[in-house]
UniProtKB/Swiss-Prot annotation:
GO CC field: cytosol
Free-text function comment from the UniProt entry: Catalyzes the reductive methylation of 2'-deoxyuridine-5'-monophosphate (dUMP) to 2'-deoxythymidine-5'-monophosphate (dTMP) while utilizing 5,10-methylenetetrahydrofolate (mTHF) as the methyl donor and reductant in the reaction, yielding dihydrofolate (DHF) as a by-product. This enzymatic reaction provides an intracellular de novo source of dTMP, an essential precursor for DNA biosynthesis.
Gene name, Swiss-Prot/TrEMBL: thyA
Enzyme Commission no: 2.1.1.45
Stored PANTHER family: THYMIDYLATE SYNTHASE, THYMIDYLATE SYNTHASE 1
Catalyzed reactions: dUMP + (6R)-5,10-methylene-5,6,7,8-tetrahydrofolate = 7,8-dihydrofolate + dTMP
HAMAP family linked: Thymidy_synth_bact
InterPro entries (UniProt xref): Thymidate_synth/dCMP_Mease (IPR045097), Thymidate_synth/dCMP_Mease_dom (IPR023451), Thymidate_synth/dCMP_Mease_sf (IPR036926), Thymidylate_synthase (IPR000398), Thymidylate_synthase_AS (IPR020940)
The keyword Methyltransferase is annotated on this UniProt entry: yes
Naturally occurring in which organism (per UniProt): Corynebacterium glutamicum (strain ATCC 13032 / DSM 20300 / JCM 1318 / BCRC 11384 / CCUG 27702 / LMG 3730 / NBRC 12168 / NCIMB 10025 / NRRL B-2784 / 534)
Protein name in the entry: Thymidylate synthase
Gene3D superfamilies cross-referenced by the UniProt entry: Thymidylate synthase/dCMP hydroxymethylase domain
């Protein structure tokens, strides 16, 4: 059976056709602009198999976002350390993703829960072309430990199926993007389940899609591996969008190649 490899195909394209660029971290990158990958969520859950992706961290970070949290303590308590490099001495990150998703501040002092609003729109006006959630709050960027990389997603319903498109302005193709793909695919399943819909596609759209210079060997190793079938997501329905737990979210049939380590560019 031929296994689709849209992520690996883009990774190879960037490695072969990308331009060399300097970057904020001083590491250097090979980069292409304006790329897209599509995943049919009915053909398996897109957790990459050409290297192991730490699914526990994917789940934990998404649950943390959905709680509107901005402190890494809950993540650390659950053995997730992916945000440690950016936290201050008190564990704070400022008004990052979850805060904007759940509590976007308005000029008149109110706060908007974008996730609840998106779910309400799916239930009551599924054909809306305005069902967008944004983490890119220009007025608060300077207070964030790291401005959002995956900054906006749009939900779309057709024929009873929910699709999601993400826009990611800055895409670390080796370390970050495999994680982001799994996270937003999971979020799409959760929205669909809570709204009584089936899943359709997850579409990942990237702006600056780059491979860091210190990841070139790891990318070559990953691209030498043969992809295996995606696993199956098993999602127990929670009472609400905000009451999912680790126990509700598992994958079966995940048989990846071994982990490939790489240094995060901070």
């Amino acid at each position: 059976m031929t296994v689709p490899t849209p992520y690996e195909d883009l990774l190879r394209k960037i490695a072969e056709e990308g331009s060399h660029k300097d970057d904020r971290t001083g590491t250097g990158t090979t980069s292409l602009f304006g790329q897209q990958i599509r995943f049919d969520l009915n053909e398996g859950f897109p957790l990459l198999t050409t290297k192991k992706v730490h699914f526990h961290s994917v789940v934990g970070e998404l649950l943390w976002f959905l709680q509107g949290d901005s402190n890494v303590k809950w993540l650390q308590d659950n053995n997730i350390r992916i945000w440690n490099e950016w936290a201050d001495e008190d564990g704070e990150l400022g008004p990052v993703y979850g805060v904007q998703w759940r509590s976007w501040p308005t000029p008149d002092g109110r706060h908007i829960d974008q996730i609840s609003g998106a779910l309400e729109t799916l239930r009551n006006n599924p054909d809306s072309r305005r069902n967008i959630v944004s983490a890119w709050n220009v007025s608060e960027l300077e207070n964030m430990a790291l401005p959002p990389c995956h900054l906006l997603f749009q939900l779309y319903v057709a024929d009873g199926k929910l699709s999601c498109q993400l826009y990611q302005r800055s895409a670390d193709m080796f370390l970050g993007v495999p994680f982001n793909i799994a996270s937003y695919a999971l979020l799409t399943h959760m929205f669909a389940q809570q709204a009584g819909l089936e899943v359709g596609e997850f579409i990942w759209t990237g702006g600056d899609c780059h491979i860091y210079d210190n990841h070139k060997e790891q990318v070559a190793e990953q691209l030498s591996r043969e992809a295996r079938p995606y696993p199956t997501l098993e999602l127990n329905k929670a009472a609400s969008m905000f009451e999912y737990s680790f126990d509700d979210i598992t994958v079966s049939g995940y048989d990846p190649h071994p982990l490939i380590r790489g240094k995060v560019a901070v």
